[in-house]
């Protein structure tokens, strides 16, 4: 028989098992909170500067009279009646166009907005996943002829008029050719030197063919004006076939 001496442990040096169990969730929570805070900080830094050269200002949502609903939903009343707010269409949207509505009448049902992307003509993801018929399945060809809204030009926000520089971004990127740039002659603000000045100048401004526009939001999303776009989409209560 052999005896091996062991160091005596005091009650202060040994923590009860139930204390460890209490501390573990606390550590996990603090770690998770730290991770979220770090992620949020990185996102904020990404938004603040563009390559360290210029400050980025986020776009603000325009005040639309009529909300925009996805192609295939037929009308605002149809989607309000049949949508169960399951969020499948919002999750499936690859362009960050769909988001849950904050309106009490249509709470958590999908609503379209174009600050972060636009509704690409070749995408029909939301119509493929809807399980209730709130958004009917449509083909790419059908989508190109569905008018869910129309573009509206806001003169006071347009960069050629506010800054005296050429733009035309909306017309260049419109997938259906619904926007044309036309000459406009008048006194326009010109940024140069130390002070802003006005001078007579012919500039190009956009004109919208509302009969041809399908409301995809390409123009609104790609408009460089901040915080509000110089062109935005107003929704249609009932979708039209053009």
Region locations from a protein language model:
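Non-ligating segments of multi-cofactor redox enzymes
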Residues: 1-242
């Amino acid at each position: 028989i052999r005896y091996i001496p062991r160091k005596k442990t005091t009650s202060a040096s040994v923590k009860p098992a139930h204390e460890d169990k209490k501390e573990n969730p606390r550590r996990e929570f603090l770690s998770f909170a730290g991770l979220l805070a770090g992620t949020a900080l990185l996102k904020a830094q990404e938004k603040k500067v563009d390559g360290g050269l210029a400050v980025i200002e986020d776009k603000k949502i325009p005040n639309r009279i009529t909300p925009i609903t996805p192609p295939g939903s037929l009308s605002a009343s149809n989607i309000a009646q049949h949508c169960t707010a399951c969020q499948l269409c919002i999750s499936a949207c690859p362009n960050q166009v769909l988001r849950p509505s904050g309106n009490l009448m249509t709470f958590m049902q999908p609503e379209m907005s174009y600050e972060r992307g636009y509704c690409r003509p070749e995408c029909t993801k939301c119509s493929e996943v809807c399980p209730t018929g709130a958004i009917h399945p449509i083909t790419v060809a059908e989508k190109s002829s569905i008018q869910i809204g129309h573009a509206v030009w806001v003169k006071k926000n347009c960069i050629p008029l506010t800054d005296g520089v050429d733009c035309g971004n909306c017309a260049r990127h419109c997938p259906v050719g619904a926007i044309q740039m036309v000459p406009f002659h008048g006194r326009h603000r010109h940024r140069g030197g130390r002070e802003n000045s006005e001078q007579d100048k012919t500039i190009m401004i956009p004109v919208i063919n509302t009969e041809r526009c399908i409301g995809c939001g390409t123009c609104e999303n790609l408009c460089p004006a901040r915080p509000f776009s110089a062109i935005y989409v107003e929704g249609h209560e009932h979708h039209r076939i053009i």
